[in-house]
Amino acid sequence: MNIKNTGKIFAVLGGLTALTVLSSEIFYDFSINTKSPIHMSKLNNLVQKATNTSGSEEEASAKYSGLTGTPEMKKWYAEHGEDVYITSDSLRLHGKKFKNDGSKYVIVCHGYTSKAKHMAGFVNKFHSFGYNVLAVDARAHGDSEGTKIGMGWPDRFDVIEWIKLILSWDANAQIILHGVSMGAATVLMASGEVLPKNVKAVIADCGYTSEWDEFRLEAKNLHIPWFPVLNAASVLSKLRDGYDFKQASALEQVKKSSIPTLFIHGTEDELVPYCMLDELYTAANCEKECLTVKGAGHALSSSVAPELYWNTVENFIAKYITE
């Protein structure tokens, strides 16, 4: 091999390396960095395509009414919530507290790029069951501080801080953790940590197995070759945030959990594939139940089959909560 050909090979390799680094930076900013100009603008189109929710805001609101709530529920949410705050990982995080009688509590965790107020339907329903409800804005969402979306991994420790806040209000609190999408992954990741005995059950609605698995699917949706872009973006996450995409694993956390868990998933979920339900359910070593909602897309189980959804939830938590 002559020097000229060797130079060409190194030039090609250098170009490929530079392209990989640039692509990984773009992928990281698009997926995680909320301050990036490419984050929100591209994300909305991806979510609409994956969940088939393109159209007017009214149409989307009606489709997700089980999650976001009716206009009356949204009004009730706005009028009755009390702002509360914690500090976790040097970030000031925001939540809304909805008081009720007794010592039953539920922490409600929203999904990717959403916010607590978009969970008004769930908040209202749990409150009608007699629960004190704490709806929280995840880091880098809503009124919480932060610029990096944690995909549930650092957020699991934020949940523990919210639990501590509840226990400062009520030492006898019986606590349910409920999450949808990224919120489901968050509560599953939290369940693998050592939690106070006050935490009685977990409800995970359409949670993903790991950040790696979910971003690999996202790369596919964006027609990006996941290798080596995802690998490089994962290294960036390790350098900047202290963990890589494979570390952020709900699948590994549920193996350590002893908290009774209800797994919920729609069969037509394309954003977090239905097959992830089987993986999570099989891996969990705790008491567990599973609800499959036929025909439901991502985060739509409560909208498609509200009676089935809430009867299942109510019957499940009744096993672990004392009146």
Model-identified regions with their sequence ranges:
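Catalytic nucleophile-loop/oxyanion-hole region of alpha/beta-hydrolase
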Residues: 141-170, 174
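Catalytic histidine neighborhood in serine/cysteine hydrolases
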Residues: 281-299, 312
